[in-house]
Amino acid sequence: MTAPHETMSFQAEVKQLLHLMIHSLYSNKEIFLRELVSNASDATDKLRFEAIANPALLENDADLAIRIEADPAARTLKITDNGIGMSRDEAIRNLGTIARSGTKEFFQQLSGDQQKDAALIGQFGVGFYSAFIVADKVTVETRRAGLAADEAVRWESAGDGEFSIDAINRAERGSTITLHLREGEDDFLSSYRLQNIIRKYSDHISLPIRMPKEEWDAEAQQQKVTGEWESVNQASALWTRSKSDITDEQYQAFYQHIAHDHEAPLAWTHNRVEGRSEYTQLLYIPARAPFDLWDRNHKAGLKLYVKRVFIMDDADQLLPAYLRWVKGVVDSADLPLNVSRELLQESRDVKAIREGCAKRVLSMLEAMADSEDEAERAKYKTFWEQFGQVLKEGVGEDHGNGERIAKLLRFATTHGDTAEQSVSLVDYVGRMKEGQDKIYYVTADTWVAAKSSPHLEVFRKKGIEVVLLTDRVDEWLLSYLHEFDGKQLVSVARGDLDLGALADEAEKAEQEKASADWKEVVDRAKSVLEGKAKDVRVTLRLTDSASCLVSDDGDMSGYLQRLLKQAGQKAPDAQPILELNPEHALVKKLRDLPDGEAFGDRVRVLFDQALLAEGGMLDDPAAYVQRVNRLLA
């Protein structure tokens, strides 16, 4: 079978990525070999997996390996694997387009700062395109396992926006990538240099990486090729080796291989689990959140092996969703080789693995968070900045570990004048005032809005610490986290706020007296706000502000209503309660005004100001401006 010569254009995103890599990754050029070896390893993993159901794909060649060969005379470098290979359509799709989620978001995050962009590009997974960092032309010859020799293809590009594809004859299954090196890249023709890069980045690859064997020629005073091939890596799966035989550098290199992340992980755990389920786990906590963490199509999960045979990437059933950022490998001794994603959802062994992995990850986080070592605590601070919002999901998702997760949460509070989320609930409880039996919090869109909330005034006056919640996930968190250490979590914006022993009898008597004294004014204000406010009353919770809005017990807060509406969901139309500060001049003026426009304007302005103070939106901003202007005139 033959197909015509074709010249095609790269997808626009590929052109952009090629340009970025060539100009942003020049300081770390050697990663191209790591990426190409990683791809070759993946190709052999896929062949092993498909050959379980169809052994004929091995074509009597089960000695899977990667070969790397430099030709100084031709200035070329070849990377060959005998893995699954590609058909013509697969070559066009895999080498000409980026078929993954989050691509648009990735390009939006690029800043022009070479160091930051290099980190992002590495995280995105430069893969095959990294070849163009050192090559001005790349040729790929490939045949998919199971196809005839004349169905092989040659793909070629100079990285200039186009690529050609031709039909060729190729007896060998798999792929050969030939890099035609740019001027000045002769360093990558050195066998010694190539072996160092392989041992640095790819020593853990579980199949042999072979290079032409060289020996010293004493007569010629130089290395010469013997005609044999030798393995230059350990060629054993890292997780199958004893922990005592693995260096930190090897653990980090393996992480970079599976995560496509050039940064070192914050922590890792490597364990062999025996009992009801037998498996090995090697789990990593990354130092940086992936750019598409919040993308609904984000691929999460661990690499799954069964008895050292690769089964699938992104096995998300092996971890609860709130740990979707964890990277690593699970190798099970119990699951069948033909396990499917559907079977994983029903398997008791997988449930045991998921629970075991979750406990190990939480143990790593606890070790960092509770460490006496400042460097370890700094790692937890980094973790929280990157993944804290996702960890909050765990309180509702993982009831069995809910208490452990709650202890790991960090918040901003009124204890410090900073938006940094560094206070644990354990810290908060340890600082509670004598007689305090509740944990108080306020929710808002931003830290500035939270710390400026009128609801905090009485708490500041009494020196009571309040947790400032500003993440979108916080309202969801509160629907599950009702108490901590026996202390109920209470919103300061609740209308029935009870300070218990923190409110003295004199204050309670004063509140009752104010309610009686202001009854006539309050009743008139209720008439003005009929249909907008559920109730109007005076309060002693305010010291500086004239008014605030609170929610009745059992009603949804205004903040949560706004979040639901922003998400396009229907929110119950619960009306707030307007509370007035009887000591504020704007409120006192109400006593002197008869029913009419002036009284109505002042009441509506007090309501609208309270709504704005909590981050709400006015139904009619123009009318608000007119009322304020009339008050100022």
From Swiss-Prot:
SUPFAM superfamilies on file: ATPase domain of HSP90 chaperone/DNA topoisomerase II/histidine kinase, HSP90 C-terminal domain, Ribosomal protein S5 domain 2-like
Principal location class: cytoplasm
Chain residue ranges for the region called C: 563-633
Chain residue ranges for the region called B: 342-562
Key words, A-Z: ATP-binding, Chaperone, Cytoplasm, Nucleotide-binding, Stress response
Residue pairs linked by disulfide bridges in the UniProt entry: none
Alphabetical list of InterPro entries matching this protein: HATPase_C_sf, Heat_shock_protein_90_CS, HSP90_C, Hsp90_fam, Hsp90_N, Ribosomal_Su5_D2-typ_SF
UniProt cross-references to SMART domains, sorted A to Z: HATPase_c
GO molecular function, one term: ATP hydrolysis activity
Classification via CDD domains: HATPase_Hsp90-like (cd16927)
Coiled coil, from the record: none
Pfam families: HATPase_c_3, HSP90
Cellular component terms per the entry's GO annotation: cytoplasm
Subcellular location: Cytoplasm
A: region residues: 1-341
Quaternary structure annotation from Swiss-Prot or TrEMBL: Homodimer.
Similarity comment: family membership: Belongs to the heat shock protein 90 family.
Functional note: Molecular chaperone. Has ATPase activity.
Protein name: Chaperone protein HtpG
Source species: Cupriavidus metallidurans (strain ATCC 43123 / DSM 2839 / NBRC 102507 / CH34) (Ralstonia metallidurans)
Lineage: Bacteria, Pseudomonadati, Pseudomonadota, Betaproteobacteria, Burkholderiales
